[in-house]
């Protein structure tokens, strides 16, 4: 057995013992840190799927611990830019994420696509034998989240959601979870949360999609609509069809 396989086995054993921490950064990154110490031929390889601002940032963090060998996005300009900046132009570029999942040399993928694509890519990645880091919000619906949870259990893959607040900030959130689960504040009767509002505007000007963007695929399972730049890239977050 090579050292990378041994490192992964060690991580999975630790994850099973630590419960919730197994899906948080505090447990996930020690696995990658072990692999990062290996000789270049033994280092893990990963593919970055969705490499806009946040997706590129996640990939940049992961490449300190593993080698980025695939860059995937529906915008070819992003592919070229991130390939050059993070891989020195040596990674393979793809517009079709399924081509990334077909590669046997890739151990895990980072997913930083628009939110409405998360579920499909994450599930297919695990079914293809890949571990997954997926940005928040993970899904648009509770049912999609249940599907991902089901496939995670079925495949036994390592799955981390990029909700950094839960694993950082001095472990305050994990401490709060422990206090609640131990019953130290009694039975929770009510939970109150607040959601900020997004910007408003429109009507927006329609236009032909830029040549560098595969707009029809970008829409995915969402309603088919004409291209307007205010729906795409960073601003997708303000549309319920694509984000929460």
Each PLM stretch: what is its role?
Residues 56-58, 79-81, 98-99, 119-124, ...:
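Pocket-flanking alpha-helical
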Residues 1-20:
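N-terminal secretory signal peptides and thylakoid transit peptides that target proteins
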Residues 114, 119-167, 183:
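Beta-strand-loop-alpha-helix segment that lines the small-molecule cofactor/substrate pocket
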Residues 91-96:
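Conserved SAM-binding strand-loop segment of SAM-dependent methyltransferases
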Residues 18-87, 165-168:
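N-terminal Rossmann-like dinucleotide-binding module
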Residues 50-54, 154-244:
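Predominantly a Rossmann-like dinucleotide-binding segment in NAD(P)-dependent oxidoreductases
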Residues 109-110:
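N-terminal Rossmann-like NAD(P) cofactor-binding module of classical short-chain dehydrogenase/reductase
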